[in-house]
């Protein structure tokens, strides 16, 4: 929708690549939202910077997270619920298709024995919907489903594995499968090569 609402981007967006997306929302987000929708999240918001500093210090260097009082944790989680994402799709799917911009979906799939211990239950729960889930979303939830979209690849890895560097050992809680060995750089290079072969980039 950004390309639709900003004239300066008209004709400049040649392609969109989704990477372990949650376009269709997540059943996990549905469950989590039910837990927090009536809770006081002010305390959690105040400690958000400290938590993210542990989780991803390279993106939370001093001053990188500002205006924490404006963060809306409940709203953020709600935006990932299947209901919210389905409403977005109903409202915008025709607009997105009419932009005539190719969308390439890259998804992931894993098994319960390949995810962090504390994510095994969620992975198994998602298996009821899709045996090829990535521990957080199903294949259908990870893809745009419009005529201008194509599913290019299903990677072998869990949702965090293909997205994040290794988690610091101090916060792994003795869990395995948080070293995230998926070759992200090689995958990104392959995507750029594909886009070049399709004539979408030089």
Q: PLM features: what roles do these ranges have?
A:
Residues 1-7:
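Short glycine-enriched nucleophile-adjacent loop
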Residues 7-202:
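Helical cap/lid subdomain of alpha/beta-hydrolase-fold lipid enzymes
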